[in-house]
Amino acid sequence: MTNEDVGTNSVADRLQLGPREGVTYPIQMKYCGHCTMPIEYCEYYPEYEKCKEWLELHMPDDFERLKIEEEAAAADGTDDDKKRQKRGGKGLLRVKKKEDVPKRICVSRAARGKKKSVTVVTGLSTFDIDLKVAAKFFGTKFACGSSVTGDDEIVIQGDVKDDLFDVIPEKWAEIDEDVIEDLGDQKRT
């Protein structure tokens, strides 16, 4: 058998190197603003209806072309709902919504032993501040031990409560001095 018998002409056409006829280079891709994928792949996204709304507002000419293609596919009966995932698998990752908790920072002093005390800072996580970074900052700023002890609690060794009213707004500009609340002396639990 020779190569001509197998049909190498069609294989050679498919494996042609270089630019193809009828294609303009460089290729410009259009991306959806909702799902951030190329608009050809929006139909495979679980929230396809929202992608269509975005396309209608921002790319009306592409939306019209998409609508014509959908109508043609519906007329052929090739749609068959096979594109959307109905059950199983991971599906779409849901973004957790931020709870609307009041943004305030509470600073208190608690006794530790006979003559020693600790300063407890709570509420920094409502401002999306990394507590580990904040604890490290307080430890270096006040030359003392500082650690994250709870979900939203930093314990600083020593009585530095008065200094925190100046240090926190200075370090994090998004925190105003008015949202820092002094709870006074507390009993540690």
Swiss-Prot record:
Give the matching Pfam families. DENR_N, SUI1
Which CDD domains has this protein been placed in?
A: DENR_C
| InterPro entries named in the record | DENR/SUI1_TIF, DENR_C, DENR_eukaryotes, DENR_N, SUI1, SUI1_dom_sf
Which terms are listed as keywords in the entry? Translation regulation
Q: Answer yes or no on keyword Ubl conjugation.
A: no
Q: Name one GO biological process term.
A: positive regulation of ecdysone receptor signaling pathway
Q: Name one GO molecular function term.
A: translation initiation factor activity
Question: From which residue to which does any coiled coil extend?
Answer: none
Spell out the GO cellular component terms annotated for this protein, sorted alphabetically and separated by semicolons. protein-containing complex
Gene3D superfamilies hit by this protein = SUI1-like domain
Every copy of the SUI1 domain together lies at 105-172
User: Per the record, what phenotype accompanies loss of this gene's function?
Assistant: Animals die as pharate adults with crooked legs, abnormal genitalia and a larval-like epidermis. Proliferation of histoblast cells is impaired.
Tell me, how does this one assemble? Interacts with MCTS1.
UniProt-listed NCBIfam families: DRP1 (TIGR01159)
Q: What family classification does the UniProt entry report for this protein?
A: Belongs to the DENR family.
Q: What does this protein do?
A: Regulates translation as part of a complex with MCTS1. Specifically required for translational re-initiation in mRNAs containing upstream open reading frames (uORFs). Not required for standard translational initiation. Regulates expression of a subset of gene products including mbc, InR and EcR.
What name has this protein been given in UniProt? Density-regulated protein homolog
